[in-house]
C-alpha cells in the first residue's frame, strides 16, 4: 500500500531534517532560499524520494504535496516562467 501526503516516509524524514535546519545558527544559502518559499519540507521530501527511487514516477504523492504548497504560498508569482504557448505564468493568471 502506498503512503500519501504527510504520512509518507520521505515527508517524515524531511520534517525531521527541517527541524535540524531551523536550529542551525548559520544555515547555508540554499536552505535559506528554500525556506523562504514556505515549502522546504515538501521540496526535501520530493528530493529524498527521487534520490532513493531514481524515478520521478514513483514520487507523484511528494510532487503533488510540493505543487500544492508552492501554489498555496504564492510562489508562482515569485518565478515567471514561459508556458508552451509563449505566455508567462503571470499572463496565465491574468486570464483566470
Curated annotation (Swiss-Prot):
Membrane topology category: Peripheral membrane protein
Superkingdom of origin: Eukaryota
Keywords, ordered alphabetically: Disulfide bond, Membrane, Mitochondrion, Mitochondrion inner membrane, Repeat
Domain CHCH: 36-77
GO cellular component: cytoplasm; mitochondrial inner membrane; mitochondrial intermembrane space; nucleus
Motif (Cx9C motif 1): 39-49
Principal subcellular localisation of the protein: mitochondrion
Bridged cysteine pairs (disulfide): 39-69, 49-59
Keyword Repeat: yes
GO BP field: mitochondrial cytochrome c oxidase assembly; mitochondrial respiratory chain complex assembly
Location of the motif Cx9C motif 2: 59-69
Location in or out of the cell: Mitochondrion inner membrane; Mitochondrion intermembrane space
Family note: Belongs to the COA4 family.
Additional remarks: Present with 907 molecules/cell in log phase SD medium.
Function as written in the Swiss-Prot or TrEMBL entry: Involved in cytochrome c oxidase assembly or stability.
Domain comment (free text): The twin Cx9C motifs are involved in the recognition by the mitochondrial MIA40-ERV1 disulfide relay system and the subsequent transfer of disulfide bonds by dithiol/disulfide exchange reactions to the newly imported protein.
Protein name: Cytochrome oxidase assembly factor 4
Lineage of the organism: Eukaryota, Fungi, Dikarya, Ascomycota, Saccharomycotina
Gene: COA4
Amino acid at each position: 500500500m502506498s503512503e500519501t501526503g504527510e504520512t509518507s516516509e520521505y515527508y517524515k524524514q524531511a520534517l525531521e531534517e527541517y527541524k535540524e535546519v531551523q536550529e542551525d545558527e548559520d544555515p547555508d544559502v540554499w536552505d535559506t532560499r528554500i525556506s523562504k518559499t514556505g515549502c522546504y519540507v515538501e521540496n526535501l521530501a520530493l528530493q529524498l524520494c527521487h534520490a532513493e527511487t531514481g524515478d520521478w514516477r514513483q514520487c507523484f504523492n511528494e510532487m503533488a504535496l510540493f505543487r500544492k504548497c508552492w501554489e498555496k504560498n504564492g510562489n508562482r508569482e515569485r518565478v515567471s516562467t514561459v508556458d508552451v504557448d509563449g505566455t508567462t505564468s503571470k499572463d496565465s493568471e491574468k486570464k483566470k
